[in-house]
């Protein structure tokens, strides 16, 4: 499975567009993390707890999108994008989406 942010895959042409695929996850903040992050925000620097949480969320959303493409029989997902939104005061959604396609080798 090829996953790319570009419209094309080098050496291949899009033979069939299967449709938009997406994967998402919603993550809630942890009270312990909030306290630690609050203290760090006073002195500056990276909020490592949130960085790790968002990295995990990005991976989960990415994998769910890839699985949705596999379920359609796709060879690739092109134009992959990520979006985030706050769903409530203490939670955020991370969405990965793109276009599932069948590829044909260029001659």
UniProtKB/Swiss-Prot annotation:
One Pfam assignment: YbjQ_1
InterPro entries tied to this protein: UPF0145_dom_sf, UPF0145_YbjQ-like
Gene3D superfamilies found in the cross-reference section: Hypothetical protein apc22750. Chain B
Family assignment from sequence similarity: Belongs to the UPF0145 family.
Protein name: UPF0145 protein Memar_1285
